[in-house]
UniProtKB/Swiss-Prot annotation:
GO terms for molecular function: oxidoreductase activity, acting on the CH-OH group of donors, NAD or NADP as acceptor. GO terms for biological process: fatty acid elongation. It comes from the Bacteria. This is Uncharacterized oxidoreductase YmfI. NADP(+) binds at residues 8-15. InterPro entries: NAD(P)-bd_dom_sf, SDR, SDR_fam. SUPFAM superfamilies: NAD(P)-binding Rossmann-fold domains. Its EC number is 1.-.-.-. The gene is ymfI. Belongs to the short-chain dehydrogenases/reductases (SDR) family. It holds the Pfam family adh_short_C2. Gene3D superfamilies: NAD(P)-binding Rossmann-like Domain.
């Protein structure tokens, strides 16, 4: 029987790659999106046709207080894996960030993943199995000037992962995170081509990460090959700030 995975932010660059990778491994998929319905629907249709899996799309704004409850209320089937991938960066001085932006970023990266996971855990605990992976960021480990809000949110994700892993280990559920460095997705569009080159030059491997490389790390942590790994932050950053 195929396992079922929920992937938040499935229509974005990393989310799409994770979805494709898990579909290739036989997972049925619940693909969450916020605004990009067309991209999510096209992805679901493509994966169903290519891999013969069930792929359903679900809409929710996880930056809203009721977003997580709205999303999980529409899920009726047992969940075997959760990929907490929704997120967005924010660039700017701390003194220029208003309260509404702070609340939205904390809701999106911290509160909604907490609530979503809490709502789905009873079934996983009954089954005494499951795996959860949060897609966080290198800045959750090191922090970044002019991305203090984003760094704070991602650091909170890491604490969530470590605490939850200890709480759920007796129930046979593993919890980990993948912490990417600079990844070649639309999130990097805030930088000019020249700035992207400068960032790549700082990375020992000499280039930005590909979304597929983040997807492969995520799939590994969900797999039985990682059966004794929990509470860990797997840095996928090409040696940048390691």
């Amino acid at each position: 029987m195929n396992k079922t995975a929920l992937i938040t932010g499935a229509s974005g660059g990393i989310g799409k790659s994770i979805s494709e990778t898990l579909a290739a491994r036989g997972y049925n998929l619940l693909l969450h999106y916020n605004t990009n319905q067309n991209a999510a629907a096209e992805l679901a249709e493509k994966l169903s046709q290519m891999f013969g899996v069930n792929a359903e799309i679900l809409q929710a704004d996880l930056s809203a207080q009721d977003g997580a409850d709205k999303l999980t209320s529409s899920i009726v089937q047992p969940i075997d894996a959760i990929v907490l991938n929704s997120g967005r960066s924010h660039f700017g001085l701390i003194t220029d960030v208003d309260n509404a932006t702070v609340q939205e970023m904390v809701q999106l990266h911290v509160a909604s993943p907490y609530m979503l996971t809490r709502n789905l855990l009873p079934g996983m605990i009954r089954n005494k199995s499951g795996a959860i992976v949060a897609v966080s960021s290198i800045w959750g480990e090191t922090g970044a000037s002019c991305e203090v809000l984003y760094s704070m949110a991602k650091g909170a994700q890491h604490s969530f992962v470590k605490g939850l892993a200890k709480e759920l280990a007796p129930s046979g559920i593993r919890v980990n995170a993948v912490a990417p460095g600079a990844v070649d997705t639309n999130m990097m569009n805030q930088f000019t081509p020249a700035e992207k080159e400068e960032i790549a030059d700082e990375i020992p491997i000499g280039r930005l990460a590909r979304p597929q490389e983040i997807a492969d790390a995520t799939a590994f942590l969900l797999s039985e090959k990682a059966s004794y790994i929990t509470g860990q932050i797997l840095s996928v950053n090409g040696g940048w700030h390691c």
